[in-house]
Curated annotation (Swiss-Prot):
The gene is ispF. Its cofactor is a divalent metal cation. GO terms for biological process: isopentenyl diphosphate biosynthetic process, methylerythritol 4-phosphate pathway; terpenoid biosynthetic process. GO terms for molecular function: 2-C-methyl-D-erythritol 2,4-cyclodiphosphate synthase activity; metal ion binding. InterPro entries: MECDP_synthase, MECDP_synthase_CS, MECDP_synthase_sf. The record marks H34, T133 as: Transition state stabilizer. It comes from Clostridium botulinum (strain Eklund 17B / Type B). This is 2-C-methyl-D-erythritol 2,4-cyclodiphosphate synthase.
Amino acid sequence: MRVGLGYDVHKLVENRKLILGGVEIPYEKGLLGHSDADVLLHAIMDSLLGACALGDIGRHFPDTDNKFKGISSIKLLEEVNKLIIKNRYIINNIDSVIIAQKPKLAPYIDTMTENISNALNIKIDQINIKATTEEGLGFTGGMLGISSQSICSVIKK
């Protein structure tokens, strides 16, 4: 069994959609980034790539490449899954946390989980997503941005 860790953070700005786990969440701000800036999926992808010793999302989907501009991170997650399969790994589980002062994310977590399950072709019970705040402290607590952390385990076939 192998373990991978992922982390991502993006700045909250006006005139952008807030996409987390492939879900568009109603909010007055969204995350700034080259793609859709989905910090949850970016952290998950980095944890999976790390567990398989395949680098990180910047290596596979560089922000200098215009073909990834505005792309859905669900599509990128599907591409990561192809790499995992090609390299003969099986996903055992994923555990992630989203750190955001606002908006409240609990109502969207089940849909996020379903989106990830579908993109990776794994069962719902192999995925856990939590949301928390920093109690008004720091970058996310000050509502300047949103971050996410993910850990996963994979097994070599």
